[in-house]
Amino acid sequence: NEIGSGASGGNAGTVAVGHPPLNRRGRLRQILASLLDQEGPLYIPPRWDPNLWRWLRDFVRYCTDEHVEECMKVMAPLGKNALQSFDDIIEEEAIECGYIRSGYYKVCVTEPGLVSARNEAAAIEAYGYHPECISAEELRQREPEFSSELLGGIHYPESRSLNPLKFLEALTERARQRGARISEGVSVLSMSIISGRVVGLRTNEGEVGADAVVLATGPFSAGILNEVGIQLPLQPGKGYHRDYAIGPGGAPSIKIACELSEASVFCTPMGDFVRFAGTMEFSGFNRVMRTPRLNQLTNAARRCFPGLGSDGPKSEWCGLRPMASDGMPIIGSIRDIKGLSVATGHGMLGLTLGPVTG
């Protein structure tokens, strides 16, 4: 595979920090409803998959206020470090990737959605962030393309947005300039372990020796570790995007990113196009693009931005995120195998937490 072909290049392009994990009260109800709704924010096609159902069982067990609080104690300060890491990398490496420091809007079209968004903003504020509640009128003053359906929203100033593929390509170039060897299209078959220590990798192009290995292979990390008897609570969570060119018949020109709260869809300006990205689908390890899931992105975007034209998208994509059952990234050394570390389970925060993880 190529640099940026996965979720690291196809994501919504937002550095969103300070938010609670997906594990929250009420998720069980949403999971049950998702079994029938192919156009909802969450979709789980009914099928027999014991690993998935065990993962969902554990996920629901973590849907408590106490767990959210424990996660926030870790993730809130980590988010501030992530922002600083991005600002430093972009400036020091002079990376051109459409970096916007104006934050993003979370906008709502229903009263329950607005109440929920305001409650979340209040919780985030308690951890040192500065969300701003905004009326519908002021939202439309700031962004004239917003629909009259909007009832209000939140501005999260401590966030960033960028074109993730351009960011990755620039990082790849800088790394190679510093002597890093990056092999594309290579498949890792297994790890070579001798006397409890990792000594390399077996690939489809031969063996690669190593003194240390960092396993950062997203949702595929679980399968690689499973071969050596280590279990990770991971499931692949499929996300989608549609990109629309800005112009007549296409996407409106918007100033900064926004999240359509009820639909969980991000709208991010990326130069001459706007990316509509989101959804969560648990359907296993596949890259099958379901038309109803893609249509959900467009339908949600059109409700928020009635100026979205009838021209087709310039590109469509889906990719797999590594979803941990407790909503927390899995980072650190593997106790039973010397020289082996893992960095996965970032869920929908892979872009956000990538630099600070490194």
Model-derived regions, located:
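Short loop/edge segments at beta-strand edges and connector loops
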Residues: 135, 184-186, 315-317
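C-terminal lid/capping helical subdomain adjacent to the catalytic/cofactor pocket in oxidative enzymes
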Residues: 133, 193-195, 328-357
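Dinucleotide-binding Rossmann-like beta1-alpha1 core, especially the glycine-rich loop
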Residues: 12-135
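Glycine-rich FAD pyrophosphate-binding loop
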Residues: 1-10
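Surface-exposed helix-capping loop/turn segments at secondary-structure junctions
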Residues: 88-100, 177-181, 230-231, 305-312
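Active-site substrate-recognition segment that forms the wall
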Residues: 11-14, 19, 23-62, 189-200, ...
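Short beta-strand to alpha-helix junction loop
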Residues: 70-83, 106-116, 141-142, 154-174, ...
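Helical element adjacent to the flavin cofactor pocket in flavoenzyme catalytic cores
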Residues: 115-127, 146-212
